[in-house]
């Protein structure tokens, strides 16, 4: 395990770029002083931000490039124009070369996935990477995947997601045998499509010591924390993620409107301010920022493109944790034992936009 965690940052990624990336990384550095940074992007813009963060500057190396992947670029365009020259590619390439332990970017999701997969390649037994993230629930946190890396997938693909997600849960939640559920339209064994029923049978037959497969979980089970790990293919996973984010914003707006409607409600808010602040903190999407690309020969973390510095700091924190607690080793240990059962999926369409 490295004495220092070396993090490569795509300083040009996201809606704003360096003015969020550098302050965000500085916040994370305060929490994890055993961190060093490689900063890829426009050197002048990066140095201007570093001037306000001397502690960050002291542990950073700036690698200049004028090429940045646009948020609207198609993955094929990003690969064609930005391969080997863009800030996004160079950050990923630093992981491949062993110069960094993890790459973090707030850039274009499709381009980041395409570049990461093209450069790092997938692990043995893994046909498609997945995006996994921590999801706040009523009983704590869960790992949910896939949140949009691929569309569709057969039973072997879903079983591979379960293995990788359980490894992430063991790392983050310090669990010996995380519970794993497959997202479905019902909990009965006869519910759902053929692929998900076959995945359930495969996971039961494997009886892996690293995870406790509990069967199917319905949509409301995500928020209830019905399992430590909830597995689905990327189409439904991304819909679930966006629906949850929208619901959180809707509830926050309802509360804000209700608490400011009358003088009496404003007075009531003053008495309940502590409870409302706790609720706001629990629902803050910034604290769940940072989707991990699982299934690659290296660790890549995707931040929301429109986040602020505090939100980006949480994405950097996720990358730090994945390295410090040796996520790749834990995934590989399981795949080495059971990878022969996870033959590549035959019909999985990659989501590149």
Swiss-Prot record:
GO terms for molecular function: phosphate:acyl-[acyl carrier protein] acyltransferase activity. Pathway: Lipid metabolism; phospholipid metabolism. Pfam families: FA_synthesis. InterPro entries: FA_synthesis, Phospholipid_synth_PlsX-like. Its main location: cytoplasm. GO terms for cellular component: cytoplasm. It catalyses: a fatty acyl-[ACP] + phosphate = an acyl phosphate + holo-[ACP]. Keywords: Cytoplasm, Lipid biosynthesis, Lipid metabolism, Phospholipid biosynthesis, Phospholipid metabolism, Transferase. One of its GO terms (biological process) is phospholipid biosynthetic process. It is found in: Cytoplasm. Gene3D superfamilies: Isopropylmalate Dehydrogenase. Its EC number is 2.3.1.274. Homodimer. Probably interacts with PlsY. HAMAP family: PlsX. Belongs to the PlsX family. PANTHER family: FATTY ACID/PHOSPHOLIPID SYNTHESIS PROTEIN PLSX, PHOSPHATE ACYLTRANSFERASE. Catalyzes the reversible formation of acyl-phosphate (acyl-PO(4)) from acyl-[acyl-carrier-protein] (acyl-ACP). This enzyme utilizes acyl-ACP as fatty acyl donor, but not acyl-CoA. This is Phosphate acyltransferase. It comes from Nitrobacter winogradskyi (strain ATCC 25391 / DSM 10237 / CIP 104748 / NCIMB 11846 / Nb-255). The lineage of its organism: Bacteria, Pseudomonadati, Pseudomonadota, Alphaproteobacteria, Hyphomicrobiales. The gene is plsX.
